[in-house]
């Protein structure tokens, strides 16, 4: 934070702002072409778990409805020069979405990361004996 021309700072901030639109509903997929066409939108972010839920096919990532939705999203991003993004759980997942045209990834799914951290923490607590010292 330093002094300077406020108007110039706002201009620079606006140029550096990244706008990501989360696509996670059937309505989002229906409108993905219009969303991708909006000037200033940089990224289309896939909410894959929520999308399958809203499509009535929870966690069925090979279901024809989901596959068609992804194709529609990829086509819209390609047509309008937008970046595709999503969360990935592992290398296979990352490769699959890379091959589809996704280029921005959040590595690790929040619920899985939290589960891993909790499991590790509980393991430490379970290893303590009654005196509070760690068992060997």
Give residue ranges: language-model regions.
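Expand to "…catalyze enediolate/carbanion chemistry for C-C bond making/breaking, isomerization
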Residues: 1-136
């Amino acid at each position: 934070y330093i002094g300077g021309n406020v108007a110039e700072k706002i201009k620079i901030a606006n140029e550096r702002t990244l706008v990501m639109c989360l696509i996670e509903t059937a309505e989002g997929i229906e409108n993905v072409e219009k969303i991708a066409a909006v000037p200033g939108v940089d990224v289309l972010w896939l909410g894959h778990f929520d999308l399958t839920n809203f499509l009535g096919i929870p966690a069925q990532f090979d279901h024809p409805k989901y596959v068609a939705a992804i194709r529609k999203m990829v086509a819209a991003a390609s047509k309008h020069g937008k970046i595709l993004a999503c969360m990935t759980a592992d290398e296979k997942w990352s490769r699959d979405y890379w091959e589809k045209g996704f280029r921005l990834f959040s590595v690790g799914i929040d619920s899985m990361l939290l589960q891993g951290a909790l499991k590790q923490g509980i393991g430490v607590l379970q290893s303590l004996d009654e005196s509070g010292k760690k068992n060997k």
